[in-house]
Amino acid sequence: MIACKDRATLARRVCTLAAAVTLFCLGGVAASRAADPSPEEQKKTLSAVPADAQKYYGGYWYAGNVVADPFADWKPHPPPWQICHNDSYLGNSWRANLVAELKALTKQLADQGLAKPDLIVTNSNGDINLELSQLKAQVAQGCDIIMSYPGSATGLCSGIKDAYNKGVLFVAIDSPVTCPEGLNVATNPYYRGQFGGEWIAKQLNGKGNVIVMNGQPGTANTVAQETGLRQTVASDPGMKVVGSLFGMWTGSVAKSEVLKFLATHPEPVGAVFSTGNMGVGVGQAFEQSGRPVPIITEVTNLCSLLAYWKEKNLTAYTFVQDGGPMAYAAFIPALHMMAGQKPKVSTIFMPLPIITSDNFNDYYEPSMTVQSTCFANGKDLHLVPDEYFDQFFTGGQPRAQVKIVPTN
């Protein structure tokens, strides 16, 4: 995961090209950052990250800040907590699953006497100024925990600081904010690109042409993922990125862009690195052009992709990251915080499960079709074990216990 990120079945209505300038759909926040940190600065920053998690922090500066000991002077409110969700867009199934999971987790805490029973939800529909107003209102109205899918890395910072000063916990779900008063729980887009470059090079034996199928131009996810892939591929002289396209996380748009590219580029294409919801459209474009379907990699585990994968016997992989499991993953660190535990860093990056040919049948169901709108989450819905987050916290009391629920 890091956008409307909304990895989901989505985008027919959400991410049109006209909306590209204001909605950040699967990838989230617009890219805006300073120069790359020096090796010394990187080493200093990573020294605060648990050793076993540092491998997931490559290129961390593309996704946001990593601040050491950011909540040293912060104290949580006592239960029962009012849990709230501040969202930038609620127009697709990925976000719907996210909210459904948060509602289920809130009920579990309420049943234990630790929370009020209803999750308070706001939706700014892509308007960052409205989202900020909604955030400030949530703080004023007594929210104790605010989970959020922010529409900007910086646009909510005044509200997040206000929350921090009033003892309200703000947790950004897979769309990091730069303000140190918020806790980010996310996947690292640079790492996804790096992994993709290494995997593709291995499948092609170090020789072949690659197309990058991006989502929206200019978002942090877009820049980080493509940079991670390009820097990895550049280390192998037989590999070449021959195209960088933008499909707006929408299969039909991706198909159209690939068709246009193939019409003017007759050279063989060995692989397409797709960044969300576009794998089927990419493959169909090659078929329509009379070209062999290349290796296709993905970052969203749509059932439609697995059906197409099965039908065409693809060489492929996809990350697993539905909205419900992502919400649960972000909620666990929030519970650590509400138990008085202190996070070592402001941004917690986590790995994701990966579907390959080796474990394909653990996720595929015969009922899946190319028209399916579900996510292939498998039997174990956890993206990482709950214990993964233990290494990021010190002190405090044991956290409250909750269980992940299926929302897909």
Give the location of each predicted region:
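Hinge/cleft segment of the Venus flytrap/periplasmic-binding protein
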Residues: 35-81, 232-233, 328-408
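Extracytoplasmic "Venus flytrap"
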Residues: 37-43, 54, 58-105, 109, ...
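Hydrophobic alpha-helical segments within soluble ligand-binding/sensing domains
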Residues: 49, 61-70, 131, 185-210, ...
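Short beta-strand elements in bilobed, periplasmic/extracellular small-molecule ligand-binding domains
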Residues: 109-124, 209-212, 233-251
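Short beta-strand elements at the ligand-binding edges of bilobed clamshell
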Residues: 123, 177-199, 212-216, 244, ...
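Hydrophobic alpha-helical
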Residues: 136-138, 144-164, 229, 247-309, ...
